[in-house]
């Protein structure tokens, strides 16, 4: 077929060259955005008198027809037409005649594709924010059901201090809240229009960029045409924000994988989110959590790939920028899928409160409580730390725990020890006493839950 840009050429490209350079296999995902962008563009052209109202109306009717066909997956794209833009333009001309060729007046594929991606990411970021809020709602429900579920808190993957399981869950709620805030802030950069920037230098036609931006729901326009067509910061920012979100999901999945093991037995995954072994009949594998952990690397790769593509590109457009889309599409699909699976996995998991409780009583995670006890009686904390360290050594040598040590032994270490010492050794009491702002104390958890519920309700309303 003859190319829409073929006037300057005397030889046709080999079929394999056409296939290598074509992007329609993946950029067809922008079909709705491309058509909507064209409808706004031709509406602006008519307003400015660049095309007649009759011509614009005919073009819009043709575009609306193609949009309906696209929604029903009835459009047949061709590699020969290269990309989504030329495919749509070719179909439009076939549908309404040569007047369809006027659609591209005052526009280049460079600003056209940038506009498509801005529209696409605006929609997808809002979807991801909503899905993240739904996951946060699941976390709030689990936290509400586990305020008084006591578990070991860890540092270096060693038992450190008793905490509420709700407190642990809410840590991820606040990580996700930052993720939502990052996505929301990125919309300021996504929601601006490059349409009308042309190939790189603007256009000689008297277009109204602000009007077409308004029609598409953008908050403003790029102030520099070179920047408009060469900018991919908004995609990089999306990929970066998504990488951070996936890192948070991956960290949580790592813990879920550990907790579901026989060594921990803190939780049990629902059968819906686990698989078995083809050879070992006893196995129940946390495959969904492992997949989310694994797919995190995939999202990282998409970010690093585009950063590498962009680092050496001179202004303005270069064909290298065709490589900006597949990683973006893949990240959207991956993040949306992981958020959905994560919400279902957490909603259906069973918490083994008894095992968590056993873990926190058969360890030395209450050692800090004794140090704080001595410090509250006036002993410098460093001296208290030394005394408790010796007590722990004594216990490990005897094969006992701090709660088993008789008061006489405590008094040999320090005269400040009294009978009330045993009250602070209870894991429940240890958690309850940590009532500083943001701490694991039950009162603080209740306050945190109120804030969290307010944030999720507000998001649902919006």
Curated annotation (Swiss-Prot):
EC number: 4.3.2.1
Keyword Membrane: no
Pathway assigned to this chain's UniProt record: Amino-acid biosynthesis; L-arginine biosynthesis; L-arginine from L-ornithine and carbamoyl phosphate: step 3/3
Compartment list: Cytoplasm
GO CC annotations, alphabetized: cytosol
GO MF annotation list: argininosuccinate lyase activity
PROSITE patterns in the record: FUMARATE_LYASES
Listed HAMAP family: Arg_succ_lyase
Matching PANTHER family: ARGININOSUCCINATE LYASE (PTHR43814:SF1)
Protein name per UniProt: Argininosuccinate lyase
Organism: Bacillus cereus (strain ZK / E33L)
């Amino acid at each position: 077929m003859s190319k829409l840009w073929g006037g300057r050429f005397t030889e046709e490209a080999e079929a394999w060259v056409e296939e290598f350079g074509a992007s329609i296999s993946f950029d067809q995902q922008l079909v709705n955005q491309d058509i909507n962008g064209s409808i706004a563009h031709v509406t602006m052209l008519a307003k400015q008198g660049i095309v007649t109202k009759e011509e614009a109306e005919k073009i819009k009717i043709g575009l609306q027809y193609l949009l309906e066909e696209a929604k029903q997956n009835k459009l047949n794209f061709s590699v020969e037409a290269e990309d989504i833009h030329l495919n749509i333009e070719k179909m439009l001309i076939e549908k309404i005649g040569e007047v369809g060729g006027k659609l591209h007046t005052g526009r280049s594929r460079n600003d056209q594709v940038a506009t498509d991606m801005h529209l696409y990411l605006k929609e997808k970021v809002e979807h991801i924010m909503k899905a993240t809020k739904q996951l946060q709602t699941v976390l709030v429900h689990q936290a509400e059901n586990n305020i008084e579920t006591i578990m070991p808190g860890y540092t270096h993957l060693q038992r450190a201090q008793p905490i509420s399981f709700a407190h642990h869950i809410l840590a991820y709620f606040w990580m996700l809240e930052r993720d939502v805030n990052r996505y929301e802030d990125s919309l300021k950069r996504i929601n601006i229009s490059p349409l009308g920037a042309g190939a790189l230098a603007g256009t000689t036609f008297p277009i109204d960029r602000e009007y077409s931006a308004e029609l598409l729901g953008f908050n403003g326009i790029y102030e520099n045409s070179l920047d408009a067509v060469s900018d991919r910061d908004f995609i990089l920012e999306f990929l970066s924000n998504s990488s951070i979100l996936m890192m948070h999901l991956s960290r949580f999945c790592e813990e879920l994988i550990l907790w579901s093991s026989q060594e921990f037995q803190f939780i049990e995954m629902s059968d819906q989110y686990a698989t078995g072994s083809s050879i070992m009949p006893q196995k129940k594998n946390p495959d969904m959590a492992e997949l989310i952990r694994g797919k995190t690397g995939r999202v990282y790769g998409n970010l690093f790939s585009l950063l590498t593509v962009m680092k050496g590109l001179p202004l303005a457009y270069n064909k290298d920028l065709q490589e900006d889309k597949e990683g973006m599409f893949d990240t959207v699909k991956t993040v949306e899928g992981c958020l959905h699976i994560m919400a279902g996995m957490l909603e259906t998991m069973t918490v083994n409160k008894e095992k968590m409780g056993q873990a926190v009583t058969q360890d030395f995670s209450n050692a800090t409580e004794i140090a704080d006890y001595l410090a509250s009686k006036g002993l410098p904390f460093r001296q208290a730390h030394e005394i408790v360290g010796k007590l722990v050594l004594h216990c490990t040598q005897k094969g006992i725990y701090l709660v088993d040590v008789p008061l006489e032994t405590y008094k040999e270490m320090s005269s400040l020890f009294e009978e009330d010492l045993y009250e602070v050794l209870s894991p429940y009491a240890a958690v309850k006493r940590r009532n500083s702002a943001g701490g694991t104390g039950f009162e603080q958890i209740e306050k945190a839950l109120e804030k969290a519920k307010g944030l999720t309700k507000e998001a649902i309303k919006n």
